């Protein structure tokens, strides 16, 4: 926004209290928020969630020079599926794992950060880009920004708002429209501290063999 002077609109799907998160984003500089919320959307997996958010973005409108930005993955499900699925449903090109973005007209040059290096690719707008956290340092909240946030527009989209969109059908949204659902989740037990063996090579080898034998591993 600082470099290009563009308008930033934040979308989120969740219960009504998610408005607070959008207001926080507006206090950090976002120009407008869109809250997608309805009981019909509850229980959605990544497929159904992307279906709903894609319909909301399409209803709001996608312009020729728009860039849709998403995080690499959510911190709860950790699937990294929603961003790419939205791109597919909106028939937009997509780039994942973006660590640097440069814009020249309607062309973006994006540096993708991979496990074993990086890849530089170009894409035309409109497009979807999922970003790693190192891409940018978020602004800090300020008192002035917090007051200003409540004067900025916040749009609420419900099932009634979106029900006529081709992507929205009760068979493809919510729990009923989710191909997957979580049966249970748990926090794994903490592991104890590792054991350090000191000494020369033969000495530590003998100690390790003794420990493994005592545990009936060898």
What residue ranges belong to the model's regions?
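N-terminal glycine-rich FAD/FM-binding segment characteristic of electron-transfer flavoproteins
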Residues: 1-218
